[in-house]
Design a protein with these regions (language model features):
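A generic structural signal for ordered secondary structure
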Residues: 12, 35, 53, 60, ...
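Non-catalytic connector elements of ABC transporters
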Residues: 92, 102-216
Length: 216
């Protein structure tokens, strides 16, 4: 009914809050199609981050009353510019460390929290010795049973929790440093056939382009 007058701006306040998950997901695509056809700006108020990521073309993240980053959902999620943004959108593992090398094609971070060295395949134009954080999303970590020996991007820990979600499982890993890390893996095998179980020793590895290096 609100679209009959062809407004320039339409405010939607928790429009999908009363719907179940499947209907909510279907309605998200319907709202996107309507907005695309009409070309009207929609401002959506929601407490559901997945809903915000799905419906938005631009997201603004505020911290202490100031906008700290504006970008597409992909930019906000994959390339946060601060720890606050990385932690606010989705789930993230943050490893504090010291910059050992900073070259145009890579950086090397020594992290006591990770219990090893973190190699990233791009430079950040900062001085060696600087305090930095490596942000690593749970789904970008590969989990294997047993202990592997790699020069970097390989840390060890013990499985302390497993949450079976149907299409995926969330693993809570206690690193040897004492830090807890979250890992998300798709369930490609049936639950009874899963290789990794509670209290197993595991290795966590990731690609060099997976972490984002943050200075603040």
């Amino acid at each position: 009914r609100a679209l009959v007058k062809a407004p320039k701006l339409l405010l939607l306040d928790e429009p999908l809050g009363a719907l179940d998950k499947k209907l909510r997901e279907a309605t998200q695509f319907e709202i996107m199609n309507i907005q695309d056809k009409l070309g009207i700006t929609f401002t959506v108020v929601t407490h559901d981050q997945e809903e915000a990521m799905t419906l938005s073309t631009r997201i603004g993240v505020m911290h202490q009353g100031q906008i700290v980053q504006i970008g597409t959902p992909q930019e906000i999620y994959e390339y946060p510019n601060t720890k606050q943004v990385a932690d606010f959108i989705g789930s993230v593992n943050l490893f504090e460390g010291q910059l050992v090398e900073d070259e145009p094609d890579h950086v090397l971070i020594e992290s006591a929290e990770a219990g090893g060295r973190i190699y990233v395949d791009h430079g950040i134009s900062s001085a060696p010795g600087a305090k930095v954080w490596a942000a690593l999303r749970p789904e970008k970590i590969q989990l294997t049973k047993g202990e592997r020996a790699e020069p970097h991007n390989c840390i060890k820990g013990t499985v302390k929790g497993i949450a079976y979600m149907g299409n995926l499982s969330i693993y809570l890993i206690a690193l040897d440093s004492g830090k807890e890390v979250k890992v998300t893996m798709p369930n490609q095998m049936r639950a009874a056939e899963q290789e990794i179980g509670w209290d197993d020793r595991v290795s966590l590895t990731w690609h060099a382009n997976s972490p984002v290096v943050l200075l603040s």
